[in-house]
Structures are given as structure tokens and as C-alpha cells.
């Protein structure tokens, strides 16, 4: 019989309303079932969701719906990471208040997410800019302050003189502010810091316990924490060359074994020796100033040309006072790592080699590969950075690098300079304390007051929240809180005299470092309900982009430890399982070249194919448009597809199914119109097959078949069920999709038989059982279609509340087995035979194999050894 096409515009809102009315995705903390907490990284409310959001939140939703069906009490909340610069930019550019801009964006994005049919517990929703949320964040800040985990110090910052604000290292590009283009200045400002370095070793060691995290992310964090074991070595300075009072220079090195290859020392532009030298030389002063302006991000330092200037200062080699080395100021040495001074061994470090070649400094090889000849081993354009044997190193010659390290360390620890040991062993970390001060309005106010008499005074918890004043203006650069006529003026909580509020706000990474904890009990007066937090945490499955591998995830790991230290939670690690999904990418389209190039949106072109060639044509002008590379969807390249358009045209289930189906979830998915249309055809096919057979299926009782025509149907359904279960457990959604396609192909003919009234009762019962399994399998990915199909075949209740089906173990057992066949103990063939075949059947089948016939050459075997279910050996 003919059936109406599936209409997502009708079905999807209808089922969403039903789920909402029944509050079926609201989670109760006191539910006795085993908990499962699935969370996708919450979005910044930019105003529109993009296809990356669709993929991210669909993946989380599949996990949530699947785990719910498996009997878990699932927590799947949603909120908004709502503070930050874009809202202030909008205020400056469009004259809207950051709060109204943000909440308006939240409303429109929430509506978009709801249309996707996500099984979210919206009753726990919050935005980090809600005073109710940041009040609890201020409470945590005060607890951390009391515990000694927060402190204030003078710190060098990148200052943008046009925007009147501090820039992160990553926001300094070629010495200029990323937004204003102004030359950045270095300023000393008093800033607030979290003591993340107190946890450096623990944060590093605990990475080994995170076995459900991608190895790549763990390695990135390990490198960021950057533990190194080395030696702090004091070098005597030649007093005749020193411009100030300094008598020695302390250098941190991880390679003391290469000391005899040293040809220079290098210090940071902010080192006291550099300041002394700069005070006596305008040239050195200018160079130091240039170093400070260039930015200190690691990316900037890696790519910048290695530059230096000789200070004229000379240092005496620790093992030879007659050997003096020049001390340079260099742009690649950081004051806040080690001691702000290094020694350069050009033969063992590429950066040092480039520097030495540039400034004509000696290059002495001191380590060579074990099998090299010391007479002929030289350093060319590349330093030798491997382990090996020491050469040209006096008493170290012939030792391994490890032995040389120990020999140098032991000697220098005993050697005295000015009455104290010349060296000590040190463990260093690259990780720095987290500076959280931001000179911004749209962030969480730091709850302290500055009093001339009492100093820094915490705001009493009874006075929280310290809320942002709504009446601010953005007509001038800088922080509006500094200019506010009344907000910053307040009485000191201790002495009652006039005092000033802190006008810095917190880094927005603070807001996202504990939100997952707040979701466990967002109604609590305190930051957490420890009982609820300890019940739900860690998050069982956290899903988000690899771009957050370091900062957000590391800060969250620190925050959980700090919250444990202050009694808010009882665990160290916030995320048990981490999944980093790939991006949604799309072809780029453009016309023109160079500066005249204009990017064209996918909606403006059509693709034509002829003779195996694809070309893009502008819909309005018919001109040919250049097809460019496949890149991450971005507004700048205009290669974006609006989820609203896709959902309006095809429905949410098609969009959800497509972003899961086309490639492994950790890889990028290439968006294509053909792929989306293919997904939509599949949606329609599933609906057509089931709805046309609905009358016959509705009247039948579901029962798997043990024999006859229905047996193959039941075996296919139950085997697919078992396999897709494993796929969902591993988040291998694309594999699940492939198996579901196969099952639908298997069910097509028997469903057509039922639709035509040509199936007997046993087959119909088996197909109904299989159809129920199919609907359960697609439900996590295409929940609206699943509900519609379930209702059509006479299913009771909601699929969203139905338990996961159980596969029948007897139906998933493969009826055939493949046995290796050996001849005289060497494998020669494989035999596929019925699992329950007896000894004589196996022997007959083996003797019929060509390879066995050839080996026997007409004679009988001496014996045939059959190890049941394992192997067959023919002795000839």
C-alpha cells in the first residue's frame, strides 16, 4: 500500500513537546539506579549554533539516550559559558549592553538546540554570567584565598595602549595587539594568581590514571606541565667585565653533560644582569626593549628569528677558570623559566647551533653516536641531539651521556664557589601559576576590597555576590569599572573607612573550570552539595574539541583539586572519559585572486558534474566559481552551512544522522549536500518500509524465530543488536550506522511481504521483533523517527523511556566455524563447516579439500587429529 512520506516538520515538534510535557529527561539526584554523567563542553553564546555544535551535541545525546535505555540514571545538562570579550566588543561596536546581547543570544541558541531534539535536563540550565552562578564562584575564590591557593603579585604583562587592557601572550602578534594593531608595551601590574604550580607533580602523575583519555591529549598536557630534571650551576663572573655588583650567574640546565661544548651564556632581557648592562649601553637597552615587545608566547618564541647582543660580560667555565665565555642577552630566554639564564652548547641543540653560526661562536662536538669515529665526527647544519658517547670533554671522554650527567653533577655539588656548593640538582616545571586578573567589565568580579589601612580585605561571604553595575558605558577604551562613579567606592569591611573595590574581573577560564560540578546541584546555596557532587563526579563521558586539550582541561583538573582542598568535593579528577570529536569541514568557493578574492557561500552556488569533472557555478550569474580546499567551517571563508536551513529542509534527524554517519567521530566530517540527501533518503526508506508494513506488524506479537523463514531475520537483528551495542559503548557511531544500513537491507524483503499480506504468523512475529530492535538502534541517533515508527507498528509508550532490548545469545552464535587445517603440523588451508559437525563430517570435509588431496596423492592419511572447535591436523 502507498504511504505518506515522513514529514519531520510535523513529527519532530510533536515528539519534542511530548518529551517536554512528560519531563522525561529531568534527572533526580536520589534515583537509586547506577549513575552516568555525560557532558558536552558548554557553548559560548555567540548568537547562532553551527554545524560543529550539531555534531558535538548529537554525539553527547546519542550517549545519553543509549545509557538511559541501558538502565542508567543519566545526567545530561546544558548551560552557557557566557562571560568574555565578544560581548564587550558588541557593546563597543553596536551600543548594546553586554548582558542584553548575551541573554538574547542564549534565547536564540537555546531555541536552535531544542529543535535538534536533544535529551537535555534544561531544569539545571544556568549561564556563567548569572549572578546566582558567579556568587558561588566568588565564594570559591574566597575559600581558595583562605587556603593560600590565591595570591597577588607584581607581574609583567602585555599592555595594549589603545584598548587600555592586558593581552594574553597569544594575543600579541608580531609585537602588536591582535585587535587594535598598536605596539604592545610591557608593564608591571599587580595581578591575582591561582597556585596551580602547587599541584604540578600531581597533575603530571595523575595523567597515567586517565586511561579513557586520548593519548594525544595526555601527551599535550604532559609537555605543557613540562617537568625536567637538571642542575642549577653557578658560574663565576669576571669582575672586570661586570657593570654592576653581581659576582656570579646561576644557570639551569638539563644537559650538564655537555658543559665542555659550551660557547656562550644567554640571559633574558629582564634578567638583573641585562638591566645592569642596558643601563650602560643604549644599544643593549634598545635590544631588550625589542625583546619585551615581541611577546613571550611559546609559539612566538619558536618561530621568531633567534637574536642576541653581547653584553661584554664574561663568565668563567666551572671546570676551567681561564676559559671565559661571552654572556649574551637573547630573545629566546624567558625570565620565568629556570633562572632566566642558560648556557649554549651549539653541537647539542639546534637553537644554540643557529645562534652560534649567526654570531661566529665556536661549535665543539661533545656527544657522538656510539658507532661514530671521534676523529671524523663533525657537526654540519644540524645539531646532534641524541644520546651517545662523550668526546672533547676531558675527564668525561668515553662515558655515556647518563654517566657524564652524574659525574658532572657529583663533582659540582662538592665544588665550592664563594663558600657554597657550585651546583644543586633541581626539578623544574614549565607550568606557571595561573594569572586570572583581567581588566574587563564582562567577567566575574574578584571579591576583594582595597583599604589604605587594612590592605587587601576579602568581601564577607554574607555580602556576596559582588554584582556588576548595569549602568556602564563603552564609549572609551579601558575597563568601565575603573570609571564608574559609585560602584568601586565602598566601606572597608574591617575598619569601616572609605575603600575601593577590586576592578579586575576573573579570566573566563575560571567560569568553565567548575561548571560541571555546579550542574550536580545548581539550586544549592553553597558552590556545591558535596553529597551530590561526589555522587555524580567524575563526569563519565566528556565531549569537546581538541583545542581545549591544554588550558580548559588542565585548569579544570587544578580546580577540582583546589575544591577538594577546600572541602567542596572529595575527588581529584573531574573527567573519567574524554572524547575529542573532529570538526565539520566544507569545500571553500571563491572568485578573484589575491586581495580581490571574494569568498562565496555554499548557498550561492550549484555543483555541476560532467565527464567525471565537478565545477561550481554561481546560481545568479552563472559564472564559474573556483572550488578551493576543504577547511573548517568559518565565517571568514563563508564555507558555513546554517543548521537551521538544514533542519528546515530535511529535519533534525537527518542532520544528526549525517554528522555521525560519514566518518569516525574523532576525525573531521566533510559536509556535502549529497551526503545529507543520502541520509534523508535513508530516513524516508526506514519510514516507508515500516509504515507500509505497520498494519500487519501492529496486529502481531513480537517473537524471534528459531527455524523457518524468520530464522535469518532474527539472527540478523540480534547479531546487529550485539554489534551496535559494542559500537555505542566505544562511541564508534559510524560503524553503528553501517550495521544499521545492513539490517535495513535485510529487513526490506520480509517487510514488503508483510505489507503485501504474504507473510505467515511466525515470520511476521520475527519481523516485528526485528523491527523493534531496529527502532531501538536508531533511537539514540534519530529519536523522532524512532518514536514515529514505534507508534506506527503498535508500540506502547515512548521509545525514549523504553529499556534497551536484550539480544538472544542462541541467535548471535555463528552457526559456522572456520578451522585451520594442518598437514604434518604446517597450516595449509582453512575449513568452514557447521559448528555442530561431528568428527566424521569434519574428516570427510577435510579429505575433500584440494590441498589435502594433492598431499595424499591417492593414498590414505596415517591419521586425522581433530581438536574440537580449534584445529585439524592431517598426518600423511
Swiss-Prot record:
Its EC number is 6.1.1.4. ATP binds at residue 635. The keyword Protein biosynthesis applies. Transmembrane segments: none annotated. A motif ('KMSKS' region) lies at residues 632-636. GO terms for cellular component: cytosol. PANTHER family: LEUCINE--TRNA LIGASE, MITOCHONDRIAL, LEUCYL-TRNA SYNTHETASE. The gene is leuS. A motif ('HIGH' region) lies at residues 43-53. It catalyses: tRNA(Leu) + L-leucine + ATP = L-leucyl-tRNA(Leu) + AMP + diphosphate. The lineage of its organism: Bacteria, Pseudomonadati, Pseudomonadota, Alphaproteobacteria, Hyphomicrobiales. This is Leucine--tRNA ligase. It is an enzyme of class 6 (ligase). One of its GO terms (molecular function) is ATP binding. It comes from Sinorhizobium medicae (strain WSM419) (Ensifer medicae). InterPro entries: aa-tRNA-synth_I_CS, aa-tRNA-synth_Ia, Leu-tRNA-ligase, Leu_tRNA-synth_edit, M/V/L/I-tRNA-synth_anticd-bd, Methionyl/Leucyl_tRNA_Synth, Rossmann-like_a/b/a_fold, tRNAsynth_Ia_anticodon-bd.
Amino acid at each position: 500500500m502507498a504511504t505518506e512520506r515522513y514529514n519531520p516538520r510535523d513529527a519532530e515538534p510533536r515528539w519534542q513537546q511530548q518529551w517536554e510535557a512528560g519531563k522525561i529527561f529531568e534527572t533526580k539526584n536520589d534515583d537509586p539506579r547506577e549513575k552516568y554523567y555525560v557532558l558536552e563542553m558548554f557553548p559560548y553564546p555567540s548568537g547562532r549554533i553551527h554545524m560543529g555544535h550539531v555534531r558535538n551535541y548529537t554525539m553527547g545525546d546519542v550517549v545519553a539516550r543509549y545509557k538511559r535505555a541501558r538502565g542508567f540514571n543519566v545526567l545530561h545538562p546544558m548551560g552557557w559559558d557566557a562571560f568574555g570579550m565578544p560581548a564587550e566588543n558588541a557593546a563597543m561596536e553596536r551600543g548594546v549592553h553586554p548582558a542584553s546581547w548575551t541573554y538574547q543570544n542564549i534565547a536564540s541558541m537555546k531555541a536552535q538546540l531544542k529543535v535538534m531534539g536533544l535529551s537535555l535536563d534544561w531544569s539545571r540550565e544556568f549561564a556563567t554570567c548569572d549572578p546566582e552562578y558567579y556568587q558561588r564562584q566568588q565564594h570559591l575564590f574566597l575559600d581558595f584565598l583562605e587556603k593560600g591557593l590565591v595570591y597577588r603579585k607584581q607581574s609583567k604583562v602585555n599592555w595594549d595602549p589603545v584598548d587600555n587592557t592586558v593581552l594574553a601572550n597569544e594575543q600579541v602578534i608580531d609585537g602588536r595587539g591582535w585587535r587594535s594593531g598598536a605596539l604592545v608595551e610591557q608593564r608591571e601590574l599587580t595581578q591575582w594568581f591561582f597556585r596551580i604550580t602547587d599541584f604540578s607533580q600531581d597533575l603530571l602523575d595523575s595523567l597515567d590514571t586517565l586511561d579513557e583519555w586520548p593519548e594525544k591529549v595526555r601527551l599535550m598536557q604532559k609537555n605543557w606541565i613540562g617537568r625536567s630534571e637538571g642542575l642549577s650551576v653557578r658560574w663565576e663572573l669576571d669582575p672586570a667585565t661586570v657593570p654592576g655588583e653581581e659576582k656570579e650567574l646561576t644557570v639551569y640546565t638539563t644537559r650538564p653533560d655537555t658543559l665542555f661544548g659550551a660557547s656562550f651564556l644567554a640571559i633574558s632581557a629582564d634578567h638583573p644582569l641585562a638591566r645592569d648592562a642596558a643601563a650602560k649601553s643604549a644599544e643593549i637597552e634598545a635590544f631588550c626593549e625589542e625583546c619585551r615587545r615581541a611577546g613571550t608566547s611559546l609559539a612566538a618564541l619558536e618561530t621568531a628569528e633567534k637574536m642576541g647582543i653581547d653584553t661584554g660580560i664574561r663568565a668563567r667555565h666551572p671546570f676551567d677558570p681561564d676559559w671565559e665565555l661571552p654572556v649574551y642577552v637573547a630573545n629566546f630566554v624567558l625570565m620565568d623559566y629556570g633562572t632566566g639564564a642558560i648556557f649554549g652548547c651549539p653541537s647539542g641543540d639546534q637553537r644554540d647551533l643557529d645562534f652560534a653560526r649567526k654570531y661566529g661562536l665556536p661549535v665543539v662536538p661533545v656527544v657522538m653516536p656510539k658507532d661514530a669515529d671521534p676523529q671524523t665526527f663533525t657537526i654540519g647544519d644540524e645539531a646532534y641531539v641524541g644520546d651517545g658517547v662523550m668526546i672533547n670533554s676531558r675527564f668525561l671522554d668515553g662515558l655515556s651521556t647518563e654517566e657524564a650527567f652524574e659525574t658532572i653533577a657529583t663533582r659540582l655539588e662538592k665544588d665550592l664557589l664563594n663558600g657554597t656548593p657550585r651546583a644543586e640538582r633541581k626539578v623544574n616545571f614549565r607550568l606557571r601559576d595561573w594569572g586570572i586578573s583581567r581588566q574587563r567589565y564582562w567577567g566575574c568580579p574578584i571579591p576583594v576590597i582595597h583599604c589604605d589601612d587594612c590592605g587587601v580585605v576579602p568581601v564577607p561571604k554574607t555580602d556576596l555576590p559582588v554584582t556588576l553595575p548595569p549602568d556602564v558605558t563603552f564609549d572609551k577604551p579601558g575597563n568601565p569599572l575603573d570609571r564608574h562613579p559609585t560602584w568601586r567606592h565602598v566601606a572597608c569591611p574591617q575598619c569601616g573607612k572609605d575603600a575601593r573595590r577590586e576592578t579586575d574581573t576573573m579570566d573566563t577560564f575560571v567560569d568553565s573550570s567548575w561548571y560541571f560540578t555546579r550542574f550536580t546541584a545548581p539550586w544549592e546555596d553553597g558552590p556545591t552539595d558535596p553529597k551530590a557532587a561526589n555522587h555524580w563526579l567524575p563526569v563519565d563521558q566528556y565531549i569537546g574539541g581538541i583545542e581545549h586539550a591544554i588550558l580548559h582541561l588542565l585548569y579544570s583538573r587544578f580546580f577540582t583539586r583546589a575544591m577538594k582542598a577546600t572541602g567542596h568535593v572529595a575527588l581529584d579528577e573531574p573527567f573519567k572519559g574524554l572524547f575529542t570529536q573532529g570538526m565539520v569541514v566544507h569545500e571553500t568557493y571563491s572568485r578573484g585572486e589575491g586581495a580581490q578574492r571574494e569568498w562565496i557561500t555554499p548557498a550561492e552556488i550549484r555543483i555541476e558534474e560532467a565527464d567525471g569533472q565537478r565545477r561550481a557555478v554561481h546560481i545568479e550569474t552563472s559564472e564559474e566559481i573556483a572550488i578551493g580546499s576543504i577547511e573548517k567551517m568559518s565565517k571568514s571563508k563563508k564555507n558555513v552551512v546554517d543548521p537551521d536551513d538544514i533542519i528546515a529542509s530535511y529535519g533534525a534527524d537527518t542532520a544528526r544522522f549525517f554528522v555521525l554517519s560519514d566518518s569516525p567521530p574523532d576525525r573531521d566530517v566533510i559536509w556535502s549536500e549529497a551526503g545529507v540527501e543520502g541520509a534523508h533518503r535513508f530516513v524516508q526508506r526506514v519510514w516507508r518500509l515500516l509504515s507500509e508494513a505497520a498494519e500487519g506488524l501492529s496486529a502481531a506479537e513480537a517473537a524471534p524465530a528459531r527455524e523457518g523463514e524468520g530464522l535469518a531475520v532474527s539472527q540478523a537483528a540480534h547479531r546487529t543488536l550485539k554489534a551496535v551495542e559494542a559500537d555505542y559503548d566505544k562511541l564508534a557511531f559510524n560503524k553503528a550506522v553501517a550495521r544499521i544500513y545492513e539490517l535495513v537491507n535485510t529487513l526490506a524483503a520480509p517487510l514488503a511481504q508483510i505489507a503485501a499480506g504474504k507473510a505467515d504468523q511466525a515470520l511476521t512475529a520475527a519481523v516485528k521483533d526485528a523491527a523493534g530492535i531496529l527502532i531501538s538502534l536508531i533511537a539514540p541517533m534519530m529519536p523522532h523517527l524512532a518514536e514515529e515508527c514505534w507508534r506506527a507498528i503498535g508500540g506502547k509508550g515512548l521509545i525514549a523511556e523504553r529499556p534497551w532490548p536484550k539480544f538472544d545469545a542462541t541467535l548471535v552464535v555463528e552457526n559456522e566455524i572456520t578451522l585451520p587445517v594442518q598437514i604434518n603440523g604446517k597450516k595449509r588451508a582453512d575449513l568452514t563447516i557447521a559448528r555442530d559437525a561431528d568428527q566424521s563430517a569434519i574428516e570427510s570435509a577435510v579429505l575433500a579439500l584440494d590441498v589435502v588431496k594433492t598431499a595424499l596423492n591417492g593414498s590414505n592419511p596415517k591419521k586425522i587429529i581433530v581438536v574440537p572447535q580449534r584445529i585439524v591436523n592431517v598426518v600423511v
